């Protein structure tokens, strides 16, 4: 009976640990008609992790589904570190409240968002770098350009 209770307890811990890792909800505005003259996307976040932050980056969509992107925009305005953790904010992370924006480019080193699919890549920050549970690939496109 003791073994049964121990196994049951471990099972419940495992179930609750996996169920608690829901991904952050990320909404981009605009998503399908980003202005070529003012290429700024407003990012709305909810369900952010409470123990670490996330990174958002403009990248080329990965060639193989499920893999991390290999070409991301190196411009500082095209990357964001967002965290609800106060210590992270003191080190430069953006608070997830209010207006969070990211500037995107049609072209960047090793990237072409005019002729190929680009994404906002969401991933856990350096405090949870091995945890892939937040990885998201959110497509966007510029106004008047190729439909995806």
Can you describe what each PLM-predicted range is?
Residues 1-22:
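Secretory targeting and sorting signals
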Residues 22-148:
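Extended, solvent-exposed regions of the mature portions of secreted/cell-surface glycoproteins
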């Amino acid at each position: 009976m003791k073994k049964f209770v121990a196994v049951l307890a471990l099972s419940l811990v495992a179930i609750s640990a996996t169920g608690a890792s829901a991904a952050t909800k990320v909404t981009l505005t605009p998503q399908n008609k980003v202005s070529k003259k003012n290429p700024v996307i407003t990012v709305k976040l909810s369900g952010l992790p409470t123990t670490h932050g996330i990174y958002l980056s403009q990248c080329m969509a990965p060639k193989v589904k499920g893999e991390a992107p290999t070409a991301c925009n190196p411009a500082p305005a095209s990357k964001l570190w967002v965290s609800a953790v106060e210590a992270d904010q003191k080190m430069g992370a953006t608070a997830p409240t209010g207006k969070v924006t990211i500037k995107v480019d049609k072209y960047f080193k090793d990237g072409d968002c005019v002729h190929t699919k680009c994404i906002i890549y969401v991933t856990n920050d350096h405090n949870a770098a091995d945890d892939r549970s937040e990885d998201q690939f959110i497509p966007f496109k510029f106004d008047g350009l190729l439909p995806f």
